[in-house]
Amino acid sequence: MQDIRYVIFHKPGPAWLPGKVMFEQPGVREHVAHYRKWLDAEKLELGGPHLDTGGGGMMVPVAGVSEEEVTRFASEDPAVKSGTLLAEVRPWLIGMSK
């Protein structure tokens, strides 16, 4: 059986403050708290910011979380609602794993 995950990619939105790093952006603490709910519910496997200067990051849900649930959760993110971040959900086929 194929392991398909619906990965959330974040990038700076229209309310992103130029010259500020990710953790200085408005709403990022609430963004982290939002995804911590999924981590605590064991629905999030990995997540974090990109380390380049472009900002943004990604979240990798555990196997079995539907595209609809991932899309809904991503749209409820306070940083997405405020425009600090944009979220894109993309399907990802795990081709290699331990």
Describe each region flagged by the PLM.
Residues M1-K98:
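Conserved, structured core segments of small domains
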